[in-house]
C-alpha cells in the first residue's frame, strides 16, 4: 500500500492524501455481520454531552469483528479484504471449514486465499494465526491482545500497531506495548501473530475540515476565545493567556498533568510508557 496524493486543483486538495485502496477486494457481503449502531454524537443516555467535539458523521454500518479468536482447531480461508468505516485498519473475511464466516483484523501480509487458524498451541508463527501468549515464541510481534482470558482482544488493534513478547515470568508474559510500556499479561490470554496492516495510515494528511466532519469530529474552540463564564481561560482585554497552569473547562490541570488514578493492576506495569 502507498499514500496517494492529489494535484492541487483546490487549496484543500494541495496537501490532502489518502491510503491507496487497491488492497480492498470486495464490499461487505455477509449481512449477519453488519449492524446499525445508534449515533451517540458524544451524548450519554440523558442526551447530555459527555465527550465534546463529536457528531454523528457519515452514515455507516458496524462490522462485527471476532476479537476473541476462540474457534479452535478449525482452519479458515481468507475470502476478502474489506474496508471498515469504524477503524483505520482493513478487515479480512474468514470462511472456516465448517461454513462459519467471521471478520478479523487484517495483519500485514495477509491476503486473499491464505489460511488462518486459532488454537491454544502448536500453530506456525504466521500472520493471522492466534494462540495463547504463553505458547508464542519470545520476540514475536503480536496484535489483538487480550487483557483477561476470554474477554477478547483489547491491545494493539489499530493500523500499524503491534506488541513484542519480551519474556516470561511465572504465569505472566512480558510485553512491550505500542506506547513503549512494559507490562505483564497472563499467559492464558490470546493474541494474534503479526503487525496490524494498513501501516501507511499514519502518514495521511486530512487536508480539509470536511473530511473530519465526515469522520464525526467537530471543531474545537480555544478556551481563551470564550467568555469567563464558559472557560477559566476566557475573558480579558485583547489576547491574554492563562494566569497560571492551563486547565480544562472544569478547572482540572492539563497539558502534561497526570490524571491517571492508581489501580490494582499497576503492579503489572514494569516500566511506564515513553513520552
Swiss-Prot record:
GO biological process per UniProt: cytoplasmic translation
Ranges of biased composition (kind: Basic residues): 257-275
Keyword DNA damage: no
Origin superkingdom: Bacteria
Region Disordered: start-end pairs: 212-275
Keyword annotations from UniProtKB, A to Z: Ribonucleoprotein, Ribosomal protein, RNA-binding, rRNA-binding
GO molecular function: rRNA binding; structural constituent of ribosome; transferase activity
GO cellular component: large ribosomal subunit
SUPFAM superfamilies membership: Nucleic acid-binding proteins, Translation proteins SH3-like domain
PANTHER family the UniProt entry points to: LARGE RIBOSOMAL SUBUNIT PROTEIN UL2M (PTHR13691:SF5), RIBOSOMAL PROTEIN L2 (PTHR13691)
Family statement drawn from the similarity comment of this UniProt entry: Belongs to the universal ribosomal protein uL2 family.
Function: One of the primary rRNA binding proteins. Required for association of the 30S and 50S subunits to form the 70S ribosome, for tRNA binding and peptide bond formation. It has been suggested to have peptidyltransferase activity; this is somewhat controversial. Makes several contacts with the 16S rRNA in the 70S ribosome.
Subunit structure: Part of the 50S ribosomal subunit. Forms a bridge to the 30S subunit in the 70S ribosome.
Designated name of the protein: Large ribosomal subunit protein uL2
Source organism per UniProt: Nitratiruptor sp. (strain SB155-2)
Taxonomic placement: Bacteria, Pseudomonadati, Campylobacterota, Epsilonproteobacteria, Nautiliales
Amino acid at each position: 500500500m502507498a499514500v496517494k496524493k492529489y494535484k492541487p486543483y483546490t487549496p484543500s486538495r494541495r496537501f490532502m492524501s489518502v491510503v491507496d485502496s487497491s488492497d480492498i477486494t470486495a464490499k461487505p457481503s455477509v449481512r449477519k455481520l453488519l449492524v446499525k449502531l445508534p449515533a451517540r454524537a458524544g451524548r450519554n443516555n440523558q442526551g447530555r454531552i459527555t465527550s465534546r467535539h463529536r457528531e454523528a458523521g457519515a452514515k455507516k454500518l458496524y462490522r462485527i469483528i471476532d476479537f476473541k479468536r476462540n474457534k479452535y482447531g478449525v482452519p479458515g480461508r481468507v475470502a476478502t479484504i474489506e474496508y471498515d468505516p469504524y477503524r483505520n485498519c482493513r478487515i479480512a473475511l474468514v470462511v472456516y471449514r465448517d461454513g462459519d464466516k467471521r471478520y478479523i483484523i487484517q495483519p500485514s501480509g495477509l491476503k486473499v486465499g491464505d489460511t488462518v487458524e486459532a488454537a491454544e498451541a502448536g500453530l506456525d508463527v504466521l500472520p493471522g494465526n492466534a494462540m495463547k501468549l504463553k505458547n508464542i515464541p519470545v520476540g514475536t510481534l503480536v496484535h489483538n491482545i487480550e487483557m483477561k482470558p476470554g474477554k477478547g482482544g483489547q491491545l494493539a488493534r489499530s493500523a500499524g500497531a503491534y506488541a513484542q513478547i519480551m519474556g516470561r515470568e511465572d504465569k505472566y508474559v512480558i510485553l512491550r506495548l505500542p506506547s513503549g510500556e512494559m507490562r505483564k499479561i497472563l499467559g492464558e490470554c490470546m493474541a494474534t501473530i503479526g503487525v496490524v496492516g494498513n501501516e501507511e495510515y499514519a502518514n495521511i494528511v486530512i487536508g480539509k475540515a470536511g473530511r473530519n466532519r465526515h469522520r464525526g469530529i467537530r471543531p474545537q474552540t480555544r478556551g481563551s476565545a470564550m467568555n469567563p463564564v464558559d472557560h477559566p481561560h476566557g475573558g480579558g482585554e485583547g489576547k491574554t493567556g492563562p494566569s497560571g497552569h492551563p486547565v480544562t473547562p472544569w478547572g482540572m490541570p492539563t497539558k502534561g498533568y497526570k490524571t491517571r488514578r492508581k489501580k490494582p493492576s499497576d503492579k503489572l506495569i514494569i516500566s511506564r510508557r515513553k513520552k
